[in-house]
């Protein structure tokens, strides 16, 4: 073969390779990035925050539930009684606090003053009697025991007088700040116990936290539950999230707010629409559940994609193909 012919063939082959590479690159650009993921499985165990006997359950397995819907109730009676006791405790503490703030009435002060006069008279009598007994003791008219009895009576009367004087002084000056503060603290404690009793009564009714589908019903009416015991397991149906993974090469395309198309095997020609809501800040090895064997050993970043037009056909755990491209649009 002549040399010019060989050179010509080489040029043709090289041109074909370049053209093929360009076509492949261009097709990749046109088609955009494709990722694979699954609809997130989101379940929650529902329980009463308080314990008690299950009075009634309003739903069964497979039922659709709405946020705020009553799902079950415990026997309310113990919590209603506790609430009544807490209300009574607040009333007592409030009355005591009000008394502390108001101080003492004029009638109480007058009674305390009269008690001081009576105690003073008793002390004066006891002191005079003791003085006389001392004179008799010196003249050896009475025994030492008689003198000691007189001294004891005098000391007791003196203590009674001091107590009455202190009480009158307190009545006239009002309650001490420490006593008022203690009464206020007792009132606040009673109010906190009332709030707790109200919350316990409220929590004896189980309410759905969000829309979903009931997967399991773990107990039946009549069951006595501890607080936190699982009653239902619920699959959360809204919002619908798709979990996918992107490698570092394509991370710049998967920015929060980016719109994507979501394809399922059941409707390959009618995609759902989604928007990237979260990109993990840390890399991880691709989970085995991802349908991309070539990426399973790579370090990737987890994406959460919010499906904006989800319907009941998009079920949790379903494999999804995530398509990036101009047709998906950008934020």
Curated annotation (Swiss-Prot):
InterPro entries: CusB_D23 (IPR032317), UPF0194_membrane_YbhG (IPR022936), UPF0194_transport (IPR050465)
GO cellular component: periplasmic space
NCBIfam families xrefs: PRK03598.1
Location of the protein in the cell: Periplasm
Gene behind the chain: ybhG
Protein name as catalogued: UPF0194 membrane protein YbhG
Signal sequence, renumbered to the chain: 1-15
Keyword Transferase: no
Similarity section: Belongs to the UPF0194 family.
């Amino acid at each position: 073969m002549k040399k010019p012919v060989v050179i010509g063939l080489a040029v043709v082959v090289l041109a074909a390779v370049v053209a093929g590479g360009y076509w492949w690159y261009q097709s990749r650009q046109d088609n955009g990035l494709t990722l694979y993921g699954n609809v997130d499985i989101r379940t929650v165990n529902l329980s009463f925050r308080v314990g008690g006997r299950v009075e009634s359950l309003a739903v069964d397995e497979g039922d659709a539930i709405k946020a705020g819907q009553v799902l079950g109730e415990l026997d309310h009676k113990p919590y209603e009684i506790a609430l009544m006791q807490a209300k009574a405790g607040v009333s007592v503490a409030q009355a005591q606090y009000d008394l502390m703030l108001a101080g003492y009435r004029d009638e109480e002060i007058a009674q305390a003053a009269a008690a001081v006069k009576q105690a003073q008279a008793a002390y004066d009598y006891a002191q005079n009697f003791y003085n006389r007994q001392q004179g008799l003791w010196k003249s050896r008219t009475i025994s030492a025991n008689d003198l000691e009895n007189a001294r004891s009576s005098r000391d007791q009367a003196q203590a009674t007088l001091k107590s009455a004087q202190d009480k009158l002084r307190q009545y006239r000056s009002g309650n001490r700040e420490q006593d008022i503060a203690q009464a206020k603290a007792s009132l606040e404690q009673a109010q906190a116990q009332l709030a707790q009793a109200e919350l316990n009564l409220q929590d004896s009714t189980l309410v759905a936290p969000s829309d979903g589908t009931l997967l399991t019903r773990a107990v039946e009416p009549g069951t006595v539950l501890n607080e936190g015991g699982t009653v239902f397991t619920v699959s959360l149906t809204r919002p619908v999230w798709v979990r996918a993974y992107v490698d570092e090469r394509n991370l710049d395309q998967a920015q929060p707010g980016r719109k994507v198309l979501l394809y399922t095997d059941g409707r390959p020609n009618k995609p759902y629409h989604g928007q990237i809501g979260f990109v993990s800040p840390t890399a991880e090895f691709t989970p085995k559940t991802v349908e991309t064997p070539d990426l399973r050993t790579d370090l990737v970043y987890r994406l959460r994609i919010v499906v904006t037009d989800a319907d009941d056909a998009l079920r949790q755990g379903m494999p999804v193909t995530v398509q990036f491209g101009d047709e998906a649009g950008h934020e």
